[in-house]
């Protein structure tokens, strides 16, 4: 059977190779420190679990939802006002997705035609590339490098490229590189997109994880963003409900309407008990989210400071739940180093090459273990002699 040629758009599954190595070592009885996948190790709050239990008791909630509950859309609007001080969002400017990955993956199908140009960060979350290619769009990568502090630089985008571009995807705080935006940077990006009539798509999944006293916001804190932007906003990491797959697309009505039209052809909406969990999270206390950010910063300090202490010059992450580390000397590729690190130290991270061409030469660590376990992982790296 000949399968879809669309599958040829995607490269080899790097995570499968890492998992094969992990399974083989576990079969040998090796103890491993898995810092590769960005799944929080914190438990969801009890009130979220109870919301799910209560909703599941109602037989009506086991039917197709067909639409987003009006009270959930209102809760998103209220949350934007409470959390981000943005009071301009209305319910018809909000829709749900089964996680931001689902939304970004389908975005190109709703918004792009064959040959449209999409501006993507390099490196980036892989689904940015996937969603663009599935929509028939042509990606143009703007580089996130050490020299530009891993931040978007709109002045690096040529005039002819800007005039052709239909979408620009931005992720701040950034997965995988851990950079964060400033009001000045957001203003530059919004002005650029307005000038060239580009739809700005902001992935705001990590707005609650910003370190060293800085504070996360929304793209809609930036004047003019309402004219040119939409934003993905997720509950997955902030509320430790990654498996529940709860995210929202917020912003321009015409974009929301187009994405809703596509979604009605693909599924029958978010499971109603999950919508009830979303309402509970959006209207509930935020102190747990704030404490969690402090814990991620302590983990960041333990990993980055610990690695620097054993001779690996890893800069501090400024936000997200990830650390972006340069591959030590002596290794040709990030994948080669990752496999060696698993084999010699039992520590699992993700090769930077899986996030785009500019990711080569780096690896990504996820801050998904307690401080003491991170300390053990650092000691295992030291004892392995892998750093020379």
Regions found by a protein language model. Give the residues of each.
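Active-site phosphate-binding strand-loop segment of PLP-dependent enzymes
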Residues: 145-213
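N-terminal small-domain helix-loop-helix segment of the aminotransferase-like
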Residues: 2-4, 8-99, 106, 281-284, ...
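Helix C-cap/helix->beta junction micro-motif
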Residues: 25, 135, 195-196, 310, ...
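A short helix->loop->beta-strand "cap" motif at the edges of active sites that frequently abuts
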Residues: 116, 137, 195-199, 226-227
């Amino acid at each position: 059977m000949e399968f879809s040629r669309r599958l040829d758009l995607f490269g080899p599954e790097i995570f499968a190779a890492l998992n094969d190595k992990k399974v083989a070592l576990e079969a040998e009885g090796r103890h491993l420190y898995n810092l590769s996948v960005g799944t929080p190790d914190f438990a969801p709050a009890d009130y979220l679990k109870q919301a799910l239990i209560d909703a599941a008791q109602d037989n009506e909630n086991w039917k197709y939802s067909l639409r987003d509950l009006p009270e959930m859309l209102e809760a998103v609007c209220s949350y934007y006002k409470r959390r981000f001080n943005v009071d301009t969002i209305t319910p018809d400017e909000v829709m749900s997705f089964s996680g931001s990955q689902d939304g970004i993956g389908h975005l190109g199908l709703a918004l792009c035609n064959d040959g449209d140009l999409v501006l993507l960060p390099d490196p980036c979350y892989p689904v940015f590339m996937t969603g663009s290619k599935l929509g028939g769009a042509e990606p143009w990568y703007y580089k996130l490098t050490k020299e530009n502090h891993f931040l978007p630089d709109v002045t690096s985008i040529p005039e002819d490229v800007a005039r052709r571009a239909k979408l620009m995807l931005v992720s701040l705080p950034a997965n995988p590189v851990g950079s964060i935006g400033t009001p000045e940077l957001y203003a530059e990006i919004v002005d650029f997109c307005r000038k060239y009539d580009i739809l700005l798509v902001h992935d705001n999944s990590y707005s609650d994880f910003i370190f060293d006293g800085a504070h996360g916001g929304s793209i809609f804190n930036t004047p003019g963003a309402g004219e040119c932007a939409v934003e993905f906003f997720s509950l997955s990491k902030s509320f430790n409900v990654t498996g529940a797959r709860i995210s929202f697309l917020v912003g321009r009505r015409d974009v929301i309407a187009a994405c809703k039209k596509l979604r009605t052809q693909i599924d029958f909406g978010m499971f109603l008990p999950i919508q009830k969990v979303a309402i509970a999270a959006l209207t509930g206390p935020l102190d747990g989210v704030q404490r969690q950010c402090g814990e991620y910063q302590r983990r960041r300090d333990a990993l980055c400071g610990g690695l620097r202490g054993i001779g690996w010059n890893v800069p501090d992450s400024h936000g997200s739940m990830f650390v972006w580390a340069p591959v030590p000397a002596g290794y040709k590729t990030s994948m080669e180093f990752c496999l060696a690190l698993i084999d010699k130290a039992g520590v699992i991270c993700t090769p930077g090459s899986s996030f785009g061409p500019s990711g080569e030469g780096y690896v990504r660590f996820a801050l998904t273990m307690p401080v003491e376990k991170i300390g053990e992982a650092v000691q295992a790296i030291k004892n392995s002699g892998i750093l020379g």
